[in-house]
């Protein structure tokens, strides 16, 4: 979809957005980072438009080693975070990887301002924790020191009418999960959204990435909540979701 939206200019030579926007859209990121290093991020998005085909979208290589099919991470900002907390991305247990492959993209992030590292390199703002308050505290002192009236504080964009610097919270799914009851219980993202199934006698993860509610029997939920009916679980989930949305 990123090739078809008008937020990124698809009608001219310049896209008007940094190449960072490719980070969660194609595993070709591995190739580009090897080729350009940190110079890649601040390049124009449209410079790479012709290098991507339909086969280069999110796929097997986003989460798997192409030779062994073991889970692996390609996301530079996620690997940066893991290294900062003393974890080797290549030596993590499978139970943790079944959520971290999702955390490559389903997260809050920001693009580095000059003076805080490679320009436009994506960063996951987790150094103080995963709560909204912890994430906001990172934005208090990682911004453009030259921005009038907002010196030192980070802003994703400036409102064109009021000229007010703004934050744009993306999609903090991993952060919501890890601080929620399922994350605390050690339930992985894939346990609910890619539950195990059997095909021709083999156990494998479903690759229909969707809500467990799409299954009338709620089999993903009942792997753990075996004493509850599908109707009860559906009602409980919808009650919680409705309360949250309101």
Label every PLM stretch briefly.
Residues 24-25, 198:
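Low-complexity, Gly/Pro
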Residues 16-17, 26, 53-56:
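Active-site-adjacent structural elements in enzyme catalytic domains
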Residues 29:
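Conserved ATP-binding subdomain of kinase catalytic cores across diverse folds
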Residues 1, 34-62, 66-191, 195-246:
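Primarily the internal scaffold of c-type cytochrome electron-transfer domains
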Residues 1-15, 23:
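N-terminal alpha-helical interaction blocks
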Residues 21-24, 32-33, 37:
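Glycine-rich active-site/cofactor-binding loop and its immediate structural neighborhood
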Residues 25-26, 65:
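Short loop/turn segments at strand-loop or loop-helix junctions that form parts
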């Amino acid at each position: 979809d990123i090739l078809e939206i008008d937020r990124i200019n698809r009608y001219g030579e310049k896209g008007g957005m940094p190449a960072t926007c490719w980070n969660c859209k194609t595993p070709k990121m591995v190739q580009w980072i090897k080729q350009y290093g940190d110079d890649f991020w601040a390049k124009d998005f449209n410079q790479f438009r012709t290098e991507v085909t339909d086969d280069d979208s999110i796929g097997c290589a986003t989460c798997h080693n192409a030779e062994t099919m073991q889970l692996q991470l390609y996301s530079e900002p996620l690997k940066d975070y893991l290294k900062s907390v003393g974890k080797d991305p290549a030596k993590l247990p499978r139970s943790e990887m079944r959520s971290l492959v999702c955390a490559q993209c389903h997260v809050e992030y920001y693009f580095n301002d000059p003076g805080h590292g490679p320009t436009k390199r994506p960063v996951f703002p987790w150094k103080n924790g995963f709560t909204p308050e912890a994430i906001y505290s990172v934005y208090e002192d990682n911004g453009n020191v030259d921005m009038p009236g907002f010196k030192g504080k980070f802003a994703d964009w400036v409102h064109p009418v009021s000229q007010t610097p703004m934050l744009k919270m993306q999609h903090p799914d991993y952060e919501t999960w890890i601080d929620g009851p399922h994350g605390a219980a050690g339930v992985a993202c894939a346990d609910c959204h890619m539950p195990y199934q059997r095909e021709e006698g083999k156990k494998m993860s479903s690759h229909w990435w969707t809500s467990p509610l799409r299954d009338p029997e709620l089999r993903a939920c009942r792997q753990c909540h075996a004493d509850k009916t599908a109707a009860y679980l559906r009602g409980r989930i919808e009650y919680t979701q409705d309360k949250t949305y309101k």
